[in-house]
Regions:
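PAPS-dependent sulfotransferases, especially Golgi type II membrane carbohydrate sulfotransferases
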Residues: 84-87, 119, 147-222
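Generic detection of long, well-ordered alpha-helical segments
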Residues: 20, 24, 104, 135, ...
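PAPS-dependent sulfotransferase catalytic core
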Residues: 1-30, 164-167
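Short amphipathic alpha-helical segments that mediate assembly, nucleic-acid/protein binding
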Residues: 23-27, 111, 197, 215
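Alpha-helical packing segments of well-folded alpha/beta enzyme cores
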Residues: 29, 110-116, 141, 200-204, ...
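Short, well-structured alpha-helical segments in soluble
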Residues: 32-35
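Residues at alpha-helix termini
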Residues: 9, 15-18, 40, 61-63, ...
Length: 222
């Protein structure tokens, strides 16, 4: 959607032919086109950057002005260890950490900045879920999400989870990145972070967990 919006904003014929109003028609049609083959009453759109203010504004202006967002927050050191472990299993070539620590880089730096900026918006339509709560009390967290959206609750069996959609991780270069295990639990990752990496993670933790954020920093890295 973001690329489409940028194209519309920089497409001279829309301006020359007085068709700027067409932009909203194009944008509002995209979700229906993307999910046209899905026959479900509820669709949960997943994306690390949806909580960024420019993306929430884009959605509210074109799709649903009262849209609600669930923001999953996880300690950065856990994210780093998980990614590095996957890189090792996938025979990653090069430094395991360096590119993950570059300003504005995906999937860690830029996402952390987006979560930080999320807190600059009115908060009534955001629900923050800590990953540690999700794995330790999954049913309680799921109830919170159902209540947040006002949906009828479903009886989940968190001890026998079935993966019904498989993402092609070959496009990410990390086979197993989106594999869902049968039970919701913490999986121990045997990765020891170097001191400079641990310090980097702690600094980002401050930005996503603290109420007071460095807005300039977040804007520059999102």
């Amino acid at each position: 959607m973001w690329q489409t919006q940028q194209t519309c904003d920089n497409y001279p014929p829309l301006f020359a032919n007085h068709r700027l109003h067409t932009k909203k028609d194009i944008m509002s049609a995209l979700p229906g086109l993307y999910y046209k083959d899905v026959r479900k009453p509820i669709i949960i759109e997943k994306g690390r950057m949806w909580c960024h203010p420019v993306n929430t504004a884009m959605w509210r202006e074109n799709i649903n002005p009262d849209q609600k967002f669930v923001v999953l927050v996880r300690p950065i050191e856990d994210v780093m260890k998980s990614l590095v472990s996957l890189r090792i299993k996938n025979n990653h070539q090069g430094d395991l950490y360096e590119d993950l620590m570059q300003p504005g880089a995906e999937p860690i730096f830029r996402t952390a900045a987006a979560i930080a900026l999320c807190k600059t918006q009115p908060q009534e339509n955001f629900l923050y879920i800590d990953y540690r709560d999700l794995v330790s009390q999954p049913l309680k967290v799921l109830d919170l999400i159902y209540d947040f959206y006002g949906w009828d609750k479903f009886q989940h069996n968190v001890k026998k989870v079935k993966q019904v959609f498989t993402e092609d991780d070959a496009h990410h270069g990390l086979d197993g990145m989106h594999k869902i295990r049968e039970t919701i639990s913490v999986k121990k990752v045997n990765v020891d972070l170097p001191p400079k990496v641990a310090e980097f993670c702690e600094e980002l933790n401050k930005m996503i967990y603290d109420k007071q954020i460095d807005v300039k920093w977040a804007c520059n890295n999102s």
